[in-house]
């Protein structure tokens, strides 16, 4: 694990003992900190009896504490811990801030921080893959993979590649990334912020924490991202702010797991990061070709009778579905779920790529009303029915794509469960077996 002398003799409270919370407690204890822990569940907190004080931070005087460590899932705009800590003059932080404080005790290294509304995980994995191809020791962390504090420190010259959500940035005060990147920005998670401006300000803080001589990389696909790039230009030295033009990157047909305009943007961001890490073009080009995409993100799950089946269950809003529709010319589009938007305006430029649509879930009726004037629509309701109907209609050369433009919680536990169900249904139908069909309630 990552341990630092910076924690020695200090008092911390850790609220929530899930993965990042557990890693934080163990790192703090190993670093010599005095730790108070709490979780609403008895089992995880009982594991620290004898090594930590067991107490709810809301019930104690926090004066003199160095920080209250919470998970990114704690809504700071609603949870009482924020006001309680503020009254005691104590910062509310996350495990990424503890990592930032521990960096001085690590062997010389670099940190890449990647954020954005869509494409974070793919871009982060791609940067990690490129680093590995270049022979650089690298670790994944943040919003992907294992908690960063629970991983072994890298040797000298290593690169920590962090996917950072806005929630994690909110809990971070001193992470000066050697290379920081903002892929894109569109409305999301607005229940946690004072409107879109608050959400954008959260993303912008990643660059405010940098030094003037550290690299800031930006996509060019939306005005909100470009505005943050302009702000960074005022605080960074000349030549350290890079606005990426995906159209300048050629060879996408050679990268099977990076199809579609959104993946061209993800690749362009990753390539610019690689350049700033000093990785040669022949290495990153080879890595783009060998990259295997993440599950549920434009995942090619099967091909049968000339029809390709693509699982893009991670597309939980119209902005992330739109570029998926741009990836193929003839798509049977399965969409719907728990809506984040009552329109599909961002998808409209790619409607001519859609042969037919199949609507499911709570958003199904509304989306059907939007689409019926411009394309054939089947009101399928259930995913298993939609896949079966799309498979029956598809011709050789067509693509059957689940790209829901919605959250999953009306019918599935999460987007992973939805994508897994799609894969299982496709495999069953190809093998001429009865397709599994959930009852329409999340499990």
From Swiss-Prot:
Family, per entry: Belongs to the MurCDEF family.
Name of the protein this chain belongs to: UDP-N-acetylmuramoylalanine--D-glutamate ligase
Record's keyword annotation contains Cell cycle: yes
Record bears the keyword DNA repair: no
Top-level taxon: Bacteria
Residue numbers binding ATP: 116-122
PANTHER family the record matches: UDP-N-ACETYLMURAMOYLALANINE--D-GLUTAMATE LIGASE
Pathway where this protein functions: Cell wall biogenesis; peptidoglycan biosynthesis
Species of provenance: Novosphingobium aromaticivorans (strain ATCC 700278 / DSM 12444 / CCUG 56034 / CIP 105152 / NBRC 16084 / F199)
InterPro entries, per the entry: Mur-like_cat_sf (IPR036565), Mur_ligase_C (IPR004101), Mur_ligase_C_dom_sf (IPR036615), Mur_ligase_cen (IPR013221), MurD (IPR005762)
One biological process term in Gene Ontology: peptidoglycan biosynthetic process
């Amino acid at each position: 694990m990552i341990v630092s002398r910076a924690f020695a003799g200090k008092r911390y409270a850790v609220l929530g003992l899930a993965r990042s919370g557990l890693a934080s407690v163990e790192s703090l204890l190993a670093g010599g900190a005095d730790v108070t822990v709490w979780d609403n569940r008895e089992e995880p907190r009982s594991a620290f009896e004898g090594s930590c004080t067991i107490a709810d931070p809301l019930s104690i005087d926090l004066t003199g504490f160095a920080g209250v460590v919470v998970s990114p899932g704690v809504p700071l705009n609603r949870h009482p811990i924020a006001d309680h800590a503020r009254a005691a003059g104590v910062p509310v932080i996350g495990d990424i801030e503890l990592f930032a404080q521990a960096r001085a005790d690590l062997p010389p290294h670099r940190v890449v921080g990647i954020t954005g509304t869509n494409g974070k995980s793919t871009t982060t994995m791609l940067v990690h893959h490129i680093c590995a191809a270049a022979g650089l020791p690298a670790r994944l962390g943040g919003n992907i993979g294992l908690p960063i504090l629970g991983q072994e420190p890298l040797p000298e010259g290593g690169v920590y590649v962090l996917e950072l959500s806005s929630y994690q940035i909110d809990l971070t005060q001193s992470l000066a990334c050697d290379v920081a990147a903002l892929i894109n920005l569109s409305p999301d998670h607005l229940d946690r912020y004072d409107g879109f401006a608050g959400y954008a300000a959260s993303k912008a803080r990643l660059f405010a924490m940098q030094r003037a001589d550290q690299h800031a990389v930006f996509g060019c696909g939306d005005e909100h991202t470009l505005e943050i790039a302009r702000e960074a230009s005022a605080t960074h030295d000349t030549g350290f702010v890079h606005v990426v033009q995906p159209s300048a990157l050629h060879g996408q047909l050679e990268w099977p797991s990076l199809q579609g305009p959104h993946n061209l943007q993800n690749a362009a961001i990753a390539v610019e990061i690689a350049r700033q890490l000093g990785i040669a073009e022949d290495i990153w080009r080879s890595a783009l070709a060998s990259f295997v995409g993440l599950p549920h993100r434009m995942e090619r799950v099967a091909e049968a009778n000339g029809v390709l089946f693509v699982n893009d269950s991670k597309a939980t809003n119209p902005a992330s579905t739109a570029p998926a529709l741009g990836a193929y010319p003839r798509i049977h589009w399965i969409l719907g779920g728990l809506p984040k938007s009552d329109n599909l305006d961002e998808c409209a430029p790619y409607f001519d790529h859609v042969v037919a649509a199949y609507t499911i879930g709570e958003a199904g009726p509304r989306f059907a009303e939007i689409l019926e004037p411009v394309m054939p629509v089947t009101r399928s309701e259930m995913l298993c029915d939609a896949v079966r109907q799309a498979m029956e209609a598809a011709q050789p050369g067509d693509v059957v794509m689940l790209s829901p433009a919605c959250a999953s919680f009306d019918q599935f536990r999460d987007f992973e469960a939805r994508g897994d169900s799609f894969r299982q249904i496709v495999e069953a139908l190809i093998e001429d077996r009865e397709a599994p069909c959930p009852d329409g309630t999340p499990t």
